[in-house]
Amino acid sequence: KIFLRIPQRMFLKQNFKNYEKECGKMKRNVKQNNRSVGAVYEQAAGYYLEQNGYELIEYNYRCRDGEIDIIAKDGDCYVFCEVKYRSGRQAGNPLEAVDQRKQKKIFRCALYYTVQHGIEDAQCRFDVIGVEGTEITHIKNAFVG
């Protein structure tokens, strides 16, 4: 029996590594699909902002603390937007998906952006854009930092 356990362990280790590798590929593919779907709705939100007089500065700004979906300007005010999409009501309200933890990450990332670009004294606000099906909801000053 002991003799059989060693080959079994080796078999499991080898196959588990392959399994982990395959799962990793699947997770990456799902993540890439989610990103590409998210990118479509971020583009729609960006178009919406442009149509409402905003100047788009950047999509998907990344720093060590996280990511900001859209950075725009509304007059002299820098607007840091989080875009959330839901396919329908059964998936939940997209605006409720921006919880306190997410707000803190966005705030820290925005702080990093302002320091990096030398605009620490600029007026800023945090908006959330919810896309539900084909409906866009824009909440200005959704939270404060």
Task: Name these PLM-found stretches.
Residues 131-145:
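Short, low-complexity, polybasic intrinsically disordered segments
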Residues 7, 18-27, 85-133:
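Catalytic cores of nucleic-acid endonucleases
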Residues 63-66:
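Short acidic/glycine-enriched loop/turn segments that link adjacent beta-strands
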Residues 7, 11-18, 22-59:
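Acidic-basic catalytic patches of nuclease active cores, encompassing PD-(D/E)XK
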Residues 77-79, 125-127, 137:
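Protein kinase-like catalytic core scaffold
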